[in-house]
């Protein structure tokens, strides 16, 4: 889910951040 991190790095809802 790298897309989510690139789109919303502040939220980091993907779990990788």
Curated annotation (Swiss-Prot):
Keywords in alphabetical order: ATP-binding, Cytoplasm, Cytoskeleton, Nucleotide-binding
GO molecular function: ATP binding
Top-level taxon of the source organism: Eukaryota
Keyword match Nucleotide-binding: yes
Subcellular location per the Swiss-Prot or TrEMBL entry: Cytoplasm, Cytoskeleton
Job description of the protein: Actins are highly conserved proteins that are involved in various types of cell motility and are ubiquitously expressed in all eukaryotic cells.
Similarity section: Belongs to the actin family.
Protein name: Actin-6
Protein source organism: Glycine max
Gene (UniProt): SAC6
């Amino acid at each position: 889910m790298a897309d989510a991190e690139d789109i919303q790095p502040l939220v980091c809802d993907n779990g990788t951040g």
